[in-house]
Amino acid sequence: CVRAHLMIYELQDGSPDYPTLVSRNRPDGRPIGWGAISGMVADAEAPGILYAVNDSFYGMQPTIFRIDANQSPAAITDAIPVTRAGAPAQKLDLEGIALDGDGGFFLASEGRPGRMIPHGIYHVNAEGGIEDEIAWPKALRAVARRWASEGITRVGSTLWIAIQREFDDDPAGFVKLLSYDLESEAWGVVHYPKEPTETGWIGLSEITAHDGFLYIIERDNQIGRAARVKRLYRVALEGLAPVAIGEEPPVVEKELVRDLLPDLTRWNGYAVDKIEGFAVDAAGEAFVSTDNDGVDDSSGETHFWSIGDL
């Protein structure tokens, strides 16, 4: 565990490598505050334009951030508050975001029953106002644990949600990918096989649909030299056949796309643990981001970078 570190700098000519993500001022001159970036999604038409949500560290300020990655460093140019009846929405832990195809978004919230935060999906308009709430079915809530929704993506009329770690009814090493049909309101599930680990735990932290595949971030919870698994996998949508909640889920086949650990160490610091955002823009360029936990018990660094075209 890295409890403290010393950073050494050398003055030289050239462009700085860090920060990789900054924010612009609002029209009234006030800065846009941000942190704890979690799930991401790309604008459907404008290359380099992304949207991201913050998680429960800013529980009183759930926000959708607009990111312009066409500049260096990438810049947060707008912050859209998530509201319920005109006030900042409470009892949310936003971990995923998907476009709804009509200018709004679907947001995945990771529940925490002990704090009265429900598991669910929220449909918001372009201004961030909650228009609909999709609750988890009773059979799913009955087996859920704290480490739940960690990404959401839309494929036509189906939403796919990545679950971070095993629920009570999952065998060790397998986690759920949930499906929700917006037309029939039917839930489904498949099993995703995780990598083995001897230290800490491994879970999923993002899911993004692109060009016939579901791209999934799989990571351990280790930092520095202990970090081993920070990877991007993909699962083919063709042949994916979810079954009803409570039935035996089929196991999907995954394919390694990229080891992200070398990316995390290219800034010459220690590898942070929380890769939580992945999006592919309208031009096919893929972007990755990390969650800085709102600088609490963290180095405070947010890394945002492109891995090029998929």
Give the location of each predicted region.
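Sequence/structural signature of beta-propeller domains
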Residues: 1-310
